[in-house]
Curated annotation (Swiss-Prot):
Keywords: Ribonucleoprotein, Ribosomal protein. GO terms for cellular component: ribonucleoprotein complex; ribosome. Part of the 30S ribosomal subunit. One of its GO terms (biological process) is translation. The lineage of its organism: Bacteria, Pseudomonadati, Pseudomonadota, Betaproteobacteria, Neisseriales. Coiled coil: none annotated. PROSITE patterns: RIBOSOMAL_S10 (PS00361). Pfam families: Ribosomal_S10. Disulfide bonds: none annotated. This is Small ribosomal subunit protein uS10. Involved in the binding of tRNA to the ribosomes. SUPFAM superfamilies: Ribosomal protein S10. Belongs to the universal ribosomal protein uS10 family. One of its GO terms (molecular function) is structural constituent of ribosome.
Amino acid sequence: MQNQKIRIRLKAFDYHLIDRSAQEIVDTAKRTGAVVKGPVPLPTKIERFDILRSPHVNKTSRDQFEIRTHLRLMDIIDPTDKTVDALMKLDLPAGVDVEIKLQ
């Protein structure tokens, strides 16, 4: 697996959870001897929703809700077979979405 790169993209609503997961991935990859670049914080996606408070009148009275999606990007340069096995066995929290691409 020489001259290859693994790109890992993490997505979560809770930034504490995503930072902890990113640190676990970095520690695991460094323990197996791989070079890690990142985690790079990507821009947070914010979705806002306005909802009417009243079911009938009072259009000017609204509640506002938002969902923040935090993103992190990491590259693992020249991963070994040990690195791939260790990353596959890694147990991450349920609130973190992981996308892995081999380049």
